Each structure stands twice: as C-alpha cells, then as structure tokens.
Amino acid sequence: MLEIQTGASFKKEQANANKKGIRILRGGNILPNKYIFKDDDVFVSEEFVNANTILKKNCIITPAVTSLENIGKMAVIEKDYNNVSAGGFVFIISPYIQDFNHSLLLAYFLQSPFLIEAMRGITKKSGAAFYNLGKERLKELYLPLPPMTEQSRIVSKINEILSSIMSR
C-alpha cells in the first residue's frame, strides 16, 4: 500500500544556511495538514542527498522523532520538487497509488485520534524529551481504505468541513 523511508542523513557541518543546494524539511516545517518553508531551513549539497528522498507529489511527510504532542502531524506534498528533501528524523511515506485524494485520505486517517493513539502506543522514548516512531511498527498499523470513488467523496467532505472551520 505504501513505502516508508527516512529523509536525508548528513552531518551538522555539511549543512549550510546560504540557501544553496537541497532544502531540508525538518519536524518544525510540518504542521497539521501542511508544510512550510522557513527562513532558518538548512540546505545541503546534492552529493549528500539520495535522489529517492527528493519530495514528490502525493508523498506524505511526518516527524519520526518528536515530542508526544507532535506525533501524527502529517502533510501531503502538493507538487514534484527537484531541490527539497526531508531530514533524517522525518518519514517520507510514498503511497503506491499515485492519486492526490488517496494521499490526502491517508494523511487524514493517520491524523485521526484513533491512529494518533495507536502511533503513541508504538513509540519508544529516545532521550529526555523525544519519542521515536519506528518505521517497521508504523507499517503494521491498519488503515481502513474504501474504494477510490468513496475516498474522493470523503476527502471533499473533510475539505469542506475544514474550510468552514478555518473561515470562522
């Protein structure tokens, strides 16, 4: 149904702030249902980034190492990039079905209270304040997927409700 991988791994001294090379998205770039570029984003030379970690349309990004409160933040990539990757503490979830509504539905399901609680249950404490969401354990979660036409209908309804909430 999907592939899960971590983003680019590099040493701190290989990162730069001169906005040259590949932009690296970290946990702070991921908000519920969206991602943002920030002024303090780090960049690394292309030689340190595996081509399969470059973000493509329909991929979902989520923090892999984070605080308990941030488990379940998901963002769907809206277009193909040639110079943006995720960092090593971020999961890149690539659905085998390349359909934007399918990716949105997966992200919405993964952000549901039920699945957030399930993800919290499979995390391991890593250091004083961080939790590590294991890739293999994440792959074992069950996702209820309806037929594609129903997925589109559900996504439309969720978007309509979210739009109504945001306009208040």
Regions found by a protein language model. Name each.
Residues 83-91, 125-145:
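A short glycine-rich beta-alpha junction/loop motif
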Residues 1-9, 144-168:
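Non-catalytic DNA-recognition/assembly elements of restriction-modification systems
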Residues 11-19, 39-40, 121-123, 133:
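Short coil/turn segments at secondary-structure boundaries
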Residues 26-27, 50-111, 134:
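A short beta-sheet element
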